[in-house]
Amino acid sequence: GPMGIMGPRAGEDGHPGKPGRPGERGVVGPQGARGFPGTPGIPGFKGHNGIDGIKGQPGAPGVKGEPGAPGENGTPGQAGARGRVGGTGPAGARGSDGSVGPVGPAGPIGSAGPPGFPGAPGPKGEIGPVGNPGPSGPAGPRGEMGIPGVTGPIGPPGNPGANGISGAKGAAGIPGVAGAPGIPGPRGIPGPVGAAGATGARGIVGEPGPAGSKGESGNKGEPGSAGPQGPPGPSGEEGKRGPNGEPGSAGPVGPPGIRAGVMGPPGSRGSSGPAGVRGPSGDSGRPGEPGIMGPRGIPGSPGNVGPAGKEGPVGIPGIDGRPGPVGPAGARGEPGNIGFPGPKGPTGDPGKIGEKGHVGIAGPRGAPGPDGNNGAQGPPGPQGIQGGKGEQGPAGPPGFQGIPGPSGTAGEVGKPGERGIHGDFGIPGPAGPRGERGIPGQSGAAGPTGPIGSRGPSGPPGPDGNKGEPGVVGAPGTAGPSGPSGIPGERGAAGIPGGKGEKGETGIRGDTGNTGRDGARGAPGAIGAPGPAGATGDRGEAGPAGIAGPAGPRGEVGPAGPNGFAGPAGAAGQPGAKGERGPKGENGPVGPTGPIGSAGPAGPNGPPGPAGSRGDGGPPGVTGFPGAAGRTGPPGPSGITGPPGPPGAAGKEGIRGPRGDQGPVGRTGETGASGPPGFTGEKGPSGEPGTAGPPGSPGPQGIIGAPGIIGIPGSRGIPGVAGAVGEPGPIGIAGPSGARGPPGGVGSPGVNGAPGEAGRDGNPGSDGPPGRDGIPGHKGERGYPGNAGPVGTAGAPGPQGSVGPAGKHGNRGEPGPAGSVGPVGPVGPRGPNGPIGPRGDKGEPGDKGPRGIPGIKGHNGIQGIPGIAGQHGDQGSPGTVGPAGPRGPAGPSGPAGKDGRSGHPGAVGPAGVRVS
């Protein structure tokens, strides 16, 4: 049935998406309420400037504002570097076979199509043996350590704005349905072969898909009637043989290939590709005149046997077109484009062998019937057991080539019969003469990798290969034990300072942490220089004036009464006008030193200081004597084969070495066993029959004599000079066919004639199913461990270890002796909070301080390790089969082929009775 809709292609990872523009900053929340100022104390005598008061408790943090709306998607940035190619995902499940659609009418004959695409490169040859690694070069001297640069001052951090909440990532859209494949156009003229591309990394073999349903077998067609046999034609002249060429010199040995990684599990057998369109047959040349046989050339030495190429995939048989006349042989075209692989059907059960019918009398050839629809291809039957080949008898004498007989009407194409059980394979006979190379068919799609064969014996070491490019840096291994420290080299000059790195992207701001406890108050710092006077702020509005009462006379001052209880705090009055600042009072006497307050809680750890300069290396230790080599332990078990590593990049092509001497001629290898025969191809179209000549008159029948005794065949004489070919005599009228007589007894086999000329090679049949995997060879015995190598040189000093954890705090020391009376001591412990006083006026804003020095831009962070490629999605269902393309123009008719060699002579019938 037609193929289902083709699913999305699996394989490479797409380009990474472009990063979106960061969202807008969220709205900053309102500022928290300001705490109430304390109650003003009773103004006392102005003494010395007191110690600065303790800072009041900070107000509660304001409520975080609502996050701003997510910003619009920004302009896409530049595309990032392309990610590594992902591994091939598992093969998707095979979709169900679609229903068989109706066959459309044949389209009109289209014009010649445009030139086709360049053909795919041929299969890659097998990888040659890997050469022995060359000796390691001596380790270079260690470079001098540069002087560390001076750490720049850290600028004041800016106020980072609150980042808005990132918008939610949209859901991935549903992948669109792949469109149906277009109508295939006519096959164009093959284009030139393109340059072979670099071989890609080998993908992981996917799991085999489920087997498809079994197709129905077609009905067996009726045998067609045979046409009349034409008279023999004249024989052509034999062409002269050319001299043998001198043997060519052997080519240079190619560089060894890159060693492949560990192969994955065996994959399923690939599906068959479509069969290529058969090209027109070539025109037979005129027979040449027989020339004088030249001297026999010096036999060339057999060349080295090259590696066997990989077997190509089997293509899906295409739809048979109507047979056209055979055209002249065209120039060999370039290989066509690779077709899409079709689904592989399951191996069906062998069909039942039908009963052999009786051979009827051959009737006249009927008129050609219409081409029937091609039935569904049945599943291939199981491979039969290979049997022994029978003995090949001597070839019979070549028959005379008759004049083509009259063309009979083409009979109706019969339906293909059921495939019978494959017979035994015979012993392979001697190879026949090589036929002309057929026109290459359209290349089928490359099937999945076949199963891994057993490992063959190791070949001789090849020449040292070119040094490849460094491979992908692997994950850092565990640090080994530190080697002995080398002698420190002289300190080199300071390196050129690196370029300023790009500013990293601002990260998402974290949530505000809880407010920590106040640490112990530090010693008062030195009084800084007064800043520039700020601009005078606007004066506040004056409050409403109270009603002025009448001024009474001032009374005498009475004695002071006892202090009463403190009354409740009155309502806050309106702020009065700001008074002028009084003159600075004189410093009072220094008070006695107060007792030392208890130690406050430990404050948080400060930021880490800049890294100190690296100290000078210690003197090198004395190298100890190498210890005696220990006894070689027993070989450990083989480890599990790890997963295949990523293939390294192809190395640069090295300088071509001088041509080596030609090695001795190797012995000819034994002839391998014959492979299984391919499937029997469908019956080809019948050629156009020639016009019949006039039949000749039958001659008188003589007396049939008894067969003589077969004599001993004489030695082959020297061939005489070929005489001129006589003109054929007139052909008599054919007499009426007589009644069929009873079959005679089986006579003794006649003498086999000389072998006839080999006919032209037929079209290559489709590749047969792969043979069964051979029995894997036994693993060779493990060799004895080699002798221990010499002691290696000391390695370079390892990297500096990380800073260890901080040690525990020591016990507190005993208090020392009391010192002399010093200046004013530190502030004592904080007293209880006083009652909340009225809210004071808002102070005037001070001048904006100078902007701090911008900080040095930090280095870019270490780039993260790329993530693991995600799995590929399931393979979609197969797409529908497109309609058949237009039919191409018919080619010119070719010359008639030569008749095959004649069969064995039949048995001699009984002697006839002469009628007087």
Curated annotation (Swiss-Prot):
For the biological process aspect of GO, one term held by this record is: extracellular matrix organization
Q: Please report the PTM annotation for this entry.
A: Prolines at the third position of the tripeptide repeating unit (G-X-Y) are hydroxylated in some or all of the chains.
**Entry-linked Pfam families:** Collagen
Secreted as UniProt keyword: yes
Annotated region Disordered: where?
A: 1-167, 183-711, 732-916
Compositional bias per record (Gly residues), positions renumbered to this chain: 83-92, 384-393, 612-621, 741-750
GO cellular component annotations, sorted alphabetically? collagen trimer; extracellular matrix; extracellular space
The residue ranges flagged as biased composition, category Low complexity, are 96-114, 190-205, 261-281, 361-377, 448-457, 469-491, 515-577, 593-602, 623-632, 700-711, 785-800, 814-824
Q: What is this protein called?
A: Collagen alpha-2(I) chain
Species of origin reads Orycteropus afer (Aardvark)
Its taxonomic placement starts with:
Eukaryota, Metazoa, Chordata, Craniata, Vertebrata
